[in-house]
Design a protein with these regions (language model features):
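NAD(P)+-binding Rossmann beta1-loop-alpha1 motif at the extreme N-terminus of oxidoreductases
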Residues: 1-59, 83, 87, 92, ...
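Short, well-ordered alpha-helices that flank and scaffold nucleotide-derived cofactor binding pockets
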Residues: 17, 21, 75, 105
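Active-site-adjacent beta-strand anchor residues
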Residues: 29, 63, 93, 134-136
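A general structural signal for well-ordered alpha-helical segments in protein cores
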Residues: 36, 57, 67-70, 100-103, ...
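Alpha-helical structural signal in soluble globular domains
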Residues: 39-42, 76-79, 83, 102, ...
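A structural signal for hydrophobic residues in beta-strands of small regulatory alpha/beta folds
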Residues: 47-48, 61, 115, 134
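Beta-loop-alpha module in the N-terminal Rossmann-like domain of NAD(P)-dependent dehydrogenases
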Residues: 60-80, 93-100
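Rossmann-fold dinucleotide-binding core
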Residues: 73, 95-140
Length: 140
């Protein structure tokens, strides 16, 4: 399965590595291109826009710092919501419940199913695979 990962900072890079370890085809996008080099060296395709990362992916993950960063990568002609095709979007970003509901409603208008699944824990917890996750969303 092709997976798109938007946000390859400290946590996103670790998650991307785990996805590659599991044998998934991975496309990544990060606003700072230099943050994608470690995953690219391991076989991930680096996209020039969030939309390009999402194209052809049945599953998309965002791991971003706040709702503004999620909106910046989701919206507009180059945003991942503009990519054609159906997909499941799992937002693991640091976003309030109200913002998460707003983003999910926008995704729904674009035919994208959305789940909110923020993670908590430190980088050390991520390395040890000990992050805590919560999930929320409508019926899939």
């Amino acid at each position: 399965m092709r997976i798109a990962l938007i946000g390859t900072g400290m946590m996103g890079e670790r998650m991307g590595g785990r996805l590659l370890d599991a044998g998934h085809e991975l496309a990544v996008y990060n606003r700072t291109r230099a943050r994608t080099t470690a995953l690219e060296a391991r076989g991930a395709a680096v996209a020039g826009t969030p939309r390009a990362a999402a194209e052809g992916a049945g599953f998309l993950i965002t791991m971003l710092s706040d709702a503004g960063a999620v909106r910046a990568t989701a919206q507009g002609d180059t945003g991942f919501l503009a990519a054609p095709g159906e997909r499941l979007w799992v937002d693991m970003s640091t976003v309030s419940p109200a913002e998460s509901r707003e983003l999910a409603a926008e995704a729904h208008r674009h035919g994208v199913r959305a789940l909110d699944a923020p993670v908590s824990g430190s980088l050390g917890a991520a390395v040890r695979r000990r992050r805590r996750r919560r999930r929320g969303g409508g019926a899939l």
